[in-house]
Amino acid sequence: MTQQPAIEAAPPLLHLSGLYKSFGTNEILRGIDLEVHAGETVAIIGPSGTGKSTLLRCVNWLEKPSAGEVMLDGVRLRAEMTGKEEQQAIRALRSRVGMVFQQYNLWPHFSVLRNVTEGQVRVLGTDPGEAKAKAREFLARVRMEDFEDRYPSQLSGGQQQRVAIARTLAMGPRLVLFDEVTSALDPELVGEVLETMKQLADDGLTMLVVTHEMGFARRVADRVVFMNGGHIAEQGPAEVVFENPVHDRTRAFFDHVRRSSWTV
């Protein structure tokens, strides 16, 4: 876990202001204000259907907010933007943020190495030799360096997800969004992905993580954000939120999680 006082000495890398998102008459996000500092790992937790994944998708404009503003590393996007101005800002923002999804979305007909090099070459214009070197560097960081010639069908779900993480890192994002990346994995494979994410957090990668893995949120996150009903109900240092939650809804959530936990 990184040191919170040092992180907060600098301006935030990500600033969300007054984010709202509705689908028709269904209001999903209701005025989200949030900051994430460089080097910080922030875990977003809460009941299903409370807007956590929608919030991540608004950060990189996969879903356009109904109102509000996203500012990332000096790039500002406002919900009222349209046309060329909006498209230019979207391109600038997406060059600074990466996202790892629940599904791995690897190209099935590409090797592991090519999966990690393809975006570098086609999107960033990186020299193929340089892209391969960088791909091997990030595959090593996620402990997949011995699998570069294999194809996705030859990998376990956990291995595919680690390749997806390497592919995202190779694009050089300032911030990485993780959207419930272990939810599609067999239980025995979850640990290898969480351990990879823990190592990235220890290395200082800036991470905004939606997760149902409460142990990860508690032990790895610098800060925990509890969402309920489209709002941020509570946030603070992980240990404080888990040990001494302020709001009744947060306490009820943790009580339910504890009652629902089964041990073998």
Each predicted region: which residue ranges?
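ABC-family P-loop ATPase nucleotide-binding domain
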Residues: M1-Y20, S261-V264
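C-terminal boundary and immediately downstream tail of ABC-type ATPase nucleotide-binding domains
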Residues: T2, E239-V264
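ABC family nucleotide-binding domain
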Residues: P12-L16, Y20-A238
